[in-house]
Design a protein with these regions (language model features):
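A structural signal for short, well-ordered beta-strand segments
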Residues: 36, 87-89, 110-112
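C-terminal edge-of-domain segments
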Residues: 80, 93-138
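Short beta-strand segments
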Residues: 16-50, 69
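Conserved hydrophobic/aromatic beta-strand scaffold that supports enzyme active sites
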Residues: 19, 31, 84, 107-109, ...
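Structural motif
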Residues: 42-44, 66, 88, 114
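Short, basic/aromatic recognition patches
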Residues: 1-19
């Protein structure tokens, strides 16, 4: 069973750009736009890019795997929607090509520990829940 709701999976499947936040060596956050795909077979978020292994986000995750990831948009007239995923990131050196042509071999994979979503069902109700172990919730 997926940690994501049906609406969350549908929303993530229809989006290609999100924002990844990592923790820098001095503890400061670093946020960048990234291309991604929801990996339904592993229930993870897979992030690819060009020269990913040379990036600050790649180095940050090597030091501290805690990340936050947000996908959001705005429908007219003013209907915000979003999914926020907090979790643990892994660096994989040989899976990026699975995202499509033009992506580096490297891939960042986020395993969710907390999911927050809003506006996916047309209401303003916030849905938040922990989905990982207590040790991962820090």
């Amino acid at each position: 069973m997926s940690v994501f709701s049906v609406l969350e999976r549908e929303y993530l499947g229809g989006q290609r750009l999100g924002r990844l936040a990592t923790v820098g060596p001095d503890g400061a956050p670093h946020v960048v736009p990234v291309s991604f795909a929801y990996n339904g077979s592993l229930d993870t978020i897979d992030i690819g890019g060009h020269a990913l292994a040379d990036s600050k986000k790649w180095r940050d995750i090597g030091r501290d795997p805690r990340v936050a990831f947000v996908v959001d948009d705005l429908l007219p007239p003013w209907r915000p929607r979003m999914v926020e995923i907090r979790g643990q990131a892994s660096r994989l050196g040989d899976a990026g090509a699975s995202l499509g042509p033009g992506f580096a071999d490297e891939l960042i994979r986020i395993t969710p520990t907390r999911i927050v979503s809003f506006g996916l069902d047309g209401t303003r109700d916030l849905r938040a829940r922990n989905v990982g172990s207590a040790a991962d919730q820090r």
